[in-house]
Structures are given as C-alpha cells and as structure tokens.
Swiss-Prot record:
InterPro entries hit by this protein: Hemolysin-typ_Ca-bd_CS, Hemolysn_Ca-bd, MetalloPept_cat_dom_sf, Pept_M10B, Peptidase_M10B_C, Peptidase_Metallo, Serralysin-like, Serralysin-like_metalloprot_C
Family, similarity comment: Belongs to the peptidase M10B family.
GO CC, any one term: extracellular space
Hemolysin-type calcium-binding repeats, residue ranges: 345-362, 363-380
Protein name according to UniProt: Serralysin
Binding site for Ca(2+) 2: 301, 303, 340, 342
Amino acid sequence: MEKYMSLKKKISYSEDKDVSGSEKANELLKWLQAYIPGKDSNIVVEHEPSKDAAKELIRGDYRWGHQDDDKSKAFQLKYTFLESKPDDMPWHISEFSAFNEKQKAAAKLSIQSWADVANINFVETTDAKEANITFGFFDVSLTGSYAFAYLPRPEKTQLGTWYNAKSRTFSNNDIDVNGYGRQTFTHEIGHTLGLQHPADYNASDEVSPTYKNSATYFEDSRAYTVMSYFSEKNTGQDFKGIYSSAPLLNDISAIQAVYGANNTIRADDTVYGFNSNTDRDFYTAKDENSKLLFTAWDTGGNDTFDFSGFTQDQRINLNEASFSDVGGLKGNVSIARGVTIENAIGGSGNDVLIGNDAANTLKGGAGDDIIYGGLGADNLWGGEGKDTFVYLSAKESPPLERDWIHDFVSGEDKIDVSLFDLGEAGKGGVRFVREFTGEVGEAVLRYNTVDKVNDFAINLGGEFSYDDFWVKIVGEPILESDFILS
C-alpha cells in the first residue's frame, strides 16, 4: 500500500459531533467521558468544577520558615515519635501516650507516600528538640478531637500531629493499607506540609461539615484528595468503604507546586497492581480479593497497569488525570497530571481498555473486551473472548504510526469503525471497495500470505497519504463481516 501515500490532510475526531454508532462504540464514548462532571450522566453535580482545585489546597500559602523558592533542591524536614509528654502539649488534650512499633511503621509509610511525590527529604530523629514534625497520642480531649495537626508558619520550627488513642482506628487493622487510620496519618502530615482542607471547614465547626453545605467546588471529595472530609460518592466514585493511604490526584499537584516534584522515583519500567515492583502496598494487588486505591506518580520507563487477576468488569483508562474502575470499585485508580503509563492488562471480566497518546500495549485478557488504543503506534491483544477494537479517527493509526492487532479471530472479534470521523465530506460513512478511487470513506482490505498479516486502510479523500488510516492485523485472513461499519 505504500504507493497510495502522497499528500497530507488534516482531520480530527469531534466528541460533540452528532453521530450514532454501534453499541460497543457508544459504550466506549461513555467511558471516555466517565467521571467528567457535566458529561457523565451518572454524576449529580452539586457544585461547579474548579479549574484550580489543586491550588485550593494551598490557598493560604502556608510555608516553613526555612523553606526557599528553589524547588530543584530537596527540602529537609525532620520528624520524631514523642516518647514523653512535651512541655507545649496543646491545652485541650491530655494523658499523653507514645506510638507503638506498628503505629510507627504505618506513619512512616504515610510519610514515605508524600516523599514519593514531592521533593522533600524526611529524616527521622530521636531528639525531639530538633524535630520539625512530631507524632503523639492523647487520651482526653476537651474538644472531642479525633486527630489534628498544625499548618506551617515562618515563625514555627516545630509542628505537632496528634491522634486520639481511644479511637479504634489506631489500634487495629485500620492503620494497614486502605484503613481509615492510615489515611488519617497521611491527611495530618499533609497539613504539616501546608495543605489545607479544600474549603474552610473543620471538624470543630458547630455544625458538622457536609459536601452539600460546606464544599465550594465539585472536586472536594476523597476521590481527588486525602485532605477532604467528604465521600468519593459525591463525585461519582465508590471505594466500598476503603480509604486512600497516599496522596491523590489534587494532593500531588498541590504539594509539587510548593516543594517541586520527586523526579527520580519510579524512573524505570514500573508495574502497578499484580506483579508490582513498586515496593508500595497501595500500588500492589496480591490476589483477586485485593482492593486498590491510588493515584499513580511515575517519572519514566515503560510502565504497566496489571489488573489481570481481577474477575470483575473493569474500565482501564491510561490518560493522565483520568479515573479507572478496577477490581470491583469505581474510579479507584487515577493517574497524576503529567504522568504517562504505557501499558494495561485487563482481567477475566468484560473490560474496556483505553490508551493514551503514547505507543501503548493493551491486553484485554479473558472476557468480551473493548480495546481502544487512542493515538500512538499501539500493539493490541484482545485475549480470549469476543473482543471489539474501536477506532474513532485516522489519527489513531496513520500509515507511519500503525497499530498492530495481534490475536484477531475472524468470526469472533470485531473491528468497529461505526463512529469513524470522516469529516464533513464523509457523510456516506466507511464502505469497502476493491480499489481506492479517491472518495472519502473508501476502505480496502488486503492479506499478505507470506507474512500472514491483514492490512485494513481507510481513505480520507484524494490520493492515499500519510494522514489516512492503516492498521495491521496479524493472523489468518479476515473478512469484511468482521468489521462494524455503521
């Protein structure tokens, strides 16, 4: 087909276009808009979304006195676990107690989770006088406090984080991954780093804060930030009673705006989920009953979301700032802004895999999957089951960056171009012809008997060129009936 290439043409797919496609293509469109307020019909939008949601967490510009504006250098903070009552213990709490070893280990994991995303060097010290951040328990609170911490100020060299020892969340499995106690450690440490609640509410308010009455913008939920008081269900997600152990989407953006990013962590090929090499419990799935809740921060390499051990129907989206439904939860996995995850592996359910602009490798696994590579030269596997490979525009597989479909089974799998954008001149839709004549929407199917590769191409008009569409399908000859054209 090289002879068809010549002139360049511009065309792109429009989400707002008035189109009707197949059931699978429309399901893909639905998931491309998932968790976007105003586009996802499952979300009741009580507050307007904010373009500055992450900045709201640092709206007070709280900073340490020894902090400068050079974010290229790691900022050092020392911390300690108090062993005795300090002289300046807050007036409204009493009956001090120290952290035990398990509690210390959990708090250190929360500290580590902040160091993973920000250019901060945390150093443990046993000298309480030189510590910037202290950890301690209390048994009695005149104000009924569960936990609290202080925000940094230029005149302060030490801040305390305090936790109610009588709360069961700090004495049982709740300080393990996904527990409320573990999230509390992460939340209070966030305060000592300068992060506020998303709006001006607090547990000490006379009237208990609620999302409806206290949130000032849409993203004030535990799907976007560990600094929120409000359930992720308010923004469309559902974590089934678990809590994030590490900073989430807006936390990461906010903390990096203050301290700079950790640009050295996970710079190699990283696997999240099953077969994880992250050495982080919140990024790791051990069996089909594992529950994942995280925002991925990654700085390089060829990286993979491996959710192969789950049996539920999953929706895996590799685009930055997107949310995925993984392992039976809703919107529980997200990707930090500026991060590229290249690959995804689905499980044994009927999954939807959505690629990004990179060269993705997408593997659906068992089940009847929908595979969408997006831009970039992608390698696609449907796996067992009746799989559908969807294309929406020529930019998703141009001749010089062709996709490869590796395990297509004629009579079972489908290639769906029912929503393929042909521009204003392509009202006739995609249709098969024996040879290109220059008409918009003409499609040609060829088979190379030597290489055992099918070539499927669509012309956008005129002589076939580098801006048209061409995908390679490995295996036995496929038929026109294997395609969904409308």
